[in-house]
Regions:
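P-loop/Walker A NTP-binding module and the surrounding RecA-like catalytic core of P-loop NTPases
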Residues: 1-202
Length: 202
Protein backbone atom coordinates (compact mmCIF):
# COMPACT_ATOMS: atom_id res chain seq x y z
CA UNK A 1 0.00 0.00 0.00
CA UNK A 2 1.39 3.40 -1.05
CA UNK A 3 0.55 6.49 0.99
CA UNK A 4 1.29 10.06 -0.07
CA UNK A 5 1.76 12.64 2.70
CA UNK A 6 1.07 16.23 1.68
CA UNK A 7 0.84 19.60 3.42
CA UNK A 8 2.69 22.90 3.72
CA UNK A 9 6.14 23.05 5.28
CA UNK A 10 6.18 23.23 9.05
CA UNK A 11 2.95 21.35 9.78
CA UNK A 12 4.76 18.28 11.12
CA UNK A 13 4.53 16.01 8.06
CA UNK A 14 7.80 14.20 8.61
CA UNK A 15 7.16 13.70 12.33
CA UNK A 16 3.68 12.35 11.59
CA UNK A 17 5.10 9.86 9.08
CA UNK A 18 7.56 8.72 11.74
CA UNK A 19 4.83 8.26 14.34
CA UNK A 20 2.46 6.33 12.06
CA UNK A 21 5.42 4.27 10.88
CA UNK A 22 6.24 3.42 14.49
CA UNK A 23 2.67 2.23 15.12
CA UNK A 24 2.74 0.04 12.01
CA UNK A 25 6.13 -1.41 12.94
CA UNK A 26 4.64 -2.40 16.31
CA UNK A 27 1.98 -4.28 14.35
CA UNK A 28 4.75 -6.18 12.57
CA UNK A 29 4.44 -4.38 9.22
CA UNK A 30 7.45 -3.80 6.97
CA UNK A 31 7.52 -0.05 6.30
CA UNK A 32 9.56 2.02 3.82
CA UNK A 33 9.96 5.81 4.09
CA UNK A 34 10.66 7.76 0.90
CA UNK A 35 12.22 11.24 1.12
CA UNK A 36 10.59 13.02 -1.85
CA UNK A 37 10.72 16.43 -0.13
CA UNK A 38 14.12 17.07 -1.68
CA UNK A 39 14.16 20.84 -1.34
CA UNK A 40 14.96 20.92 2.34
CA UNK A 41 18.03 19.04 3.49
CA UNK A 42 16.50 19.01 6.98
CA UNK A 43 13.44 17.11 5.73
CA UNK A 44 15.54 14.35 4.18
CA UNK A 45 17.71 14.13 7.29
CA UNK A 46 14.76 14.14 9.68
CA UNK A 47 12.98 11.35 7.80
CA UNK A 48 16.18 9.30 7.89
CA UNK A 49 16.36 9.71 11.67
CA UNK A 50 12.73 8.58 12.03
CA UNK A 51 13.41 5.55 9.81
CA UNK A 52 16.31 4.58 12.03
CA UNK A 53 14.34 5.18 15.21
CA UNK A 54 11.40 3.06 14.07
CA UNK A 55 13.34 0.33 12.30
CA UNK A 56 11.82 1.28 8.95
CA UNK A 57 13.44 1.21 5.53
CA UNK A 58 14.61 4.53 4.06
CA UNK A 59 14.97 5.62 0.43
CA UNK A 60 16.56 8.95 -0.46
CA UNK A 61 18.63 10.59 -3.17
CA UNK A 62 19.58 13.51 -0.94
CA UNK A 63 18.75 17.16 -1.43
CA UNK A 64 17.76 18.63 -4.83
CA UNK A 65 17.04 15.26 -6.43
CA UNK A 66 13.98 15.03 -8.69
CA UNK A 67 11.10 14.11 -6.32
CA UNK A 68 9.27 11.98 -8.91
CA UNK A 69 12.46 10.03 -9.65
CA UNK A 70 12.96 9.40 -5.93
CA UNK A 71 9.35 8.16 -5.63
CA UNK A 72 9.77 5.94 -8.72
CA UNK A 73 12.90 4.31 -7.27
CA UNK A 74 11.24 3.89 -3.87
CA UNK A 75 8.41 2.01 -5.61
CA UNK A 76 11.03 -0.29 -7.12
CA UNK A 77 12.60 -0.93 -3.72
CA UNK A 78 9.19 -1.49 -2.07
CA UNK A 79 8.16 -4.05 -4.69
CA UNK A 80 11.53 -5.79 -4.88
CA UNK A 81 12.04 -6.04 -1.11
CA UNK A 82 8.38 -6.79 -0.40
CA UNK A 83 7.52 -3.91 1.90
CA UNK A 84 3.94 -3.82 3.18
CA UNK A 85 3.70 -0.04 3.15
CA UNK A 86 5.48 2.82 1.41
CA UNK A 87 5.17 6.33 2.90
CA UNK A 88 6.14 9.18 0.57
CA UNK A 89 7.06 12.53 2.15
CA UNK A 90 6.52 15.48 -0.23
CA UNK A 91 7.45 19.16 -0.35
CA UNK A 92 5.02 21.85 0.72
CA UNK A 93 6.18 25.07 -0.86
CA UNK A 94 2.91 26.87 -1.39
CA UNK A 95 4.50 30.10 -2.60
CA UNK A 96 5.54 28.28 -5.77
CA UNK A 97 2.07 26.93 -6.29
CA UNK A 98 2.33 25.87 -9.94
CA UNK A 99 5.65 24.07 -9.35
CA UNK A 100 4.14 22.29 -6.39
CA UNK A 101 1.11 21.22 -8.43
CA UNK A 102 3.30 19.91 -11.25
CA UNK A 103 5.52 18.06 -8.81
CA UNK A 104 2.64 16.33 -7.01
CA UNK A 105 0.98 15.44 -10.32
CA UNK A 106 4.24 13.95 -11.53
CA UNK A 107 4.76 11.93 -8.35
CA UNK A 108 1.21 10.55 -8.59
CA UNK A 109 1.73 9.72 -12.23
CA UNK A 110 4.97 7.77 -11.80
CA UNK A 111 3.75 5.75 -8.85
CA UNK A 112 0.51 4.89 -10.64
CA UNK A 113 2.56 3.72 -13.61
CA UNK A 114 4.61 1.49 -11.31
CA UNK A 115 1.64 0.12 -9.43
CA UNK A 116 -1.90 0.59 -10.81
CA UNK A 117 -4.13 2.06 -8.12
CA UNK A 118 -1.29 3.79 -6.28
CA UNK A 119 -1.23 6.01 -4.32
CA UNK A 120 -3.84 4.16 -2.31
CA UNK A 121 -4.23 7.06 0.09
CA UNK A 122 -3.33 10.71 0.05
CA UNK A 123 -3.17 12.26 3.52
CA UNK A 124 -3.18 16.01 4.14
CA UNK A 125 -1.48 17.17 7.33
CA UNK A 126 -2.99 20.37 8.73
CA UNK A 127 -1.63 22.49 11.58
CA UNK A 128 -4.54 23.14 13.98
CA UNK A 129 -3.26 26.65 14.69
CA UNK A 130 -3.40 27.92 11.08
CA UNK A 131 -7.05 28.95 11.18
CA UNK A 132 -8.72 29.91 7.91
CA UNK A 133 -5.51 29.32 5.94
CA UNK A 134 -6.21 25.63 6.28
CA UNK A 135 -9.23 25.91 3.98
CA UNK A 136 -7.15 27.51 1.25
CA UNK A 137 -4.37 24.93 1.70
CA UNK A 138 -6.88 22.10 1.43
CA UNK A 139 -8.29 23.53 -1.79
CA UNK A 140 -4.83 23.76 -3.39
CA UNK A 141 -3.68 20.30 -2.31
CA UNK A 142 -7.00 18.70 -3.23
CA UNK A 143 -6.58 20.01 -6.79
CA UNK A 144 -2.95 18.92 -6.93
CA UNK A 145 -3.03 15.51 -5.34
CA UNK A 146 -6.51 14.59 -4.17
CA UNK A 147 -7.06 14.06 -0.43
CA UNK A 148 -8.49 10.99 1.28
CA UNK A 149 -7.78 11.81 4.91
CA UNK A 150 -6.87 14.67 7.21
CA UNK A 151 -4.46 14.51 10.12
CA UNK A 152 -4.54 17.42 12.51
CA UNK A 153 -1.26 18.36 14.25
CA UNK A 154 -0.28 20.81 17.02
CA UNK A 155 -3.53 20.34 18.86
CA UNK A 156 -1.68 20.50 22.16
CA UNK A 157 -2.48 23.37 24.48
CA UNK A 158 -5.14 25.87 23.50
CA UNK A 159 -5.04 25.46 19.73
CA UNK A 160 -8.58 25.44 18.45
CA UNK A 161 -9.14 22.70 15.96
CA UNK A 162 -12.46 24.12 14.80
CA UNK A 163 -11.00 24.83 11.39
CA UNK A 164 -10.44 21.11 10.90
CA UNK A 165 -14.15 20.53 11.32
CA UNK A 166 -14.77 23.22 8.68
CA UNK A 167 -12.27 21.61 6.29
CA UNK A 168 -13.65 18.15 6.91
CA UNK A 169 -17.25 19.24 6.31
CA UNK A 170 -16.60 21.53 3.36
CA UNK A 171 -14.56 18.96 1.46
CA UNK A 172 -16.06 15.77 2.88
CA UNK A 173 -12.69 14.47 4.08
CA UNK A 174 -12.50 12.38 7.27
CA UNK A 175 -10.10 13.29 10.09
CA UNK A 176 -8.24 10.11 11.05
CA UNK A 177 -5.58 11.18 13.58
CA UNK A 178 -4.73 14.10 15.84
CA UNK A 179 -1.22 15.06 16.92
CA UNK A 180 -1.09 16.35 20.48
CA UNK A 181 2.66 16.79 20.90
CA UNK A 182 6.13 15.67 19.91
CA UNK A 183 6.28 12.26 21.56
CA UNK A 184 5.70 8.99 19.73
CA UNK A 185 2.46 8.29 21.61
CA UNK A 186 1.12 11.81 21.01
CA UNK A 187 -0.46 10.82 17.71
CA UNK A 188 -3.90 9.40 18.46
CA UNK A 189 -6.82 8.13 16.41
CA UNK A 190 -9.39 10.89 16.02
CA UNK A 191 -12.39 10.64 18.32
CA UNK A 192 -15.23 12.96 17.30
CA UNK A 193 -16.93 13.00 20.70
CA UNK A 194 -13.75 13.88 22.60
CA UNK A 195 -12.92 16.50 20.01
CA UNK A 196 -16.34 18.16 20.20
CA UNK A 197 -16.15 18.20 23.99
CA UNK A 198 -12.70 19.81 23.94
CA UNK A 199 -13.85 22.46 21.45
CA UNK A 200 -16.90 23.33 23.51
CA UNK A 201 -14.87 23.61 26.69
CA UNK A 202 -12.61 26.29 25.22
Amino acid sequence: SVVLFIGVNGVGKTTTIGKIGAQLRHQGKKVLFCAADTFRAAAVEQLGIWAERTGSGFHSKGQNADPAAVAWEAMDVAIREQYDILFIDTAGRLHTKSNLMDELHKIREVIARKHPGAPHRSILIVDATTGQNALQQTKIFKEAAGIDELILTKLDGTAKGGVAVAVSMQYGIPITYVGLGEKMEDLRPFNGDDFAKALLEQ
